[in-house]
Design a protein with these regions (language model features):
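Active-site cores that bind ATP or allylic diphosphates and position pyrophosphate for catalysis
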Residues: 2-143, 148-155, 163, 188
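Catalytic adenosine-cofactor/nucleotide-binding cores of aminoacyl-tRNA synthetases and other
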Residues: 122, 134-224
Length: 224
């Protein structure tokens, strides 16, 4: 807060609802981009406190520059700061949000790589800026592609079994399922497809991960 990387926002629920409705009606980007409180005076903040408003703490995303992440699969990825909203870090009840708690935990645990689904890449600018705000070195980000069905849509229950327990109940061997899943979106090089757990562990590298979605082919699993 003292360094200006974060600020207290005293918006009421009603005011936030009105803001979202205004953005929708006027086809504006959705989110909180500073609102009333990012540049509010000390007097306005004191008045809000005196009136009994309880603030949240928001991260002040720089809206005048690009935010950059280095992704092990996609390389350098740039985001326009003016399209990233200011996320809540501490809620009005004093509890931290995921964005705040997870990044602090990653730092304290000495995390070197954040490996997660590509649907999280839109949150990466917030996380990178949070690391910068604390003066911490950001881990390497690895946004792996989703797994799709043979029809090209994201894998879901309508494609059939998606839980490991379902495959075990159907008689599939754990080693075969692990081998099959490992090769969706990752290539060990060459044309070898049948590998033991130890062989896959030895061959695995982030460089072998593919940026495009993999396809869940049930027929190939049966073959394995």
């Amino acid at each position: 807060l003292d360094s200006g990387y974060a600020y207290k926002a005293y918006d009421t629920t009603e005011e936030l609802t009105e803001m979202r409705e205004f953005q929708q009606i006027n086809k504006q980007p959705q989110g909180y981009f500073g609102g009333t409180w990012r540049y509010a005076s000390s007097a306005d903040r004191e008045a809000a406190e005196a009136s009994g408003r309880t603030p949240v703490v928001r991260l002040a995303i720089p809206h005048d520059r690009k935010l950059v992440i280095n992704d092990a699969i996609r390389g350098r990825v740039e985001f326009d700061g003016d399209t990233s909203d200011d996320p809540v870090l501490i809620k009005a009840d004093g509890m931290p949000t995921y964005h705040f708690a997870a990044m602090v935990d990653d730092h304290l645990m000495g995390t070197t790589h954040i490996i997660r689904g590509e649907e999280w890449i839109s949150s990466a600018p917030k996380h990178v800026w949070l690391f910068e705000a604390f003066g911490w070195e950001a881990p390497m980000f690895v946004h792996v592609p989703v797994i799709k069905g043979k029809d090209g849509s994201k894998l879901s229950k309508r494609h059939g079994d998606t839980r490991c327990l379902d495959f075990r109940s159907a008689g599939y061997l754990p080693e075969a399922l692990a081998n099959f899943i490992a090769l969706i979106g990752w290539s060990p090089g060459g044309d070898r497809e049948i590998m033991s757990m130890d062989e896959m562990a030895e061959a695995f590298s982030l460089e072998g991960l593919q940026p495009s979605p993999g396809v869940f082919d049930a027929d190939k699993l049966k073959w394995m």
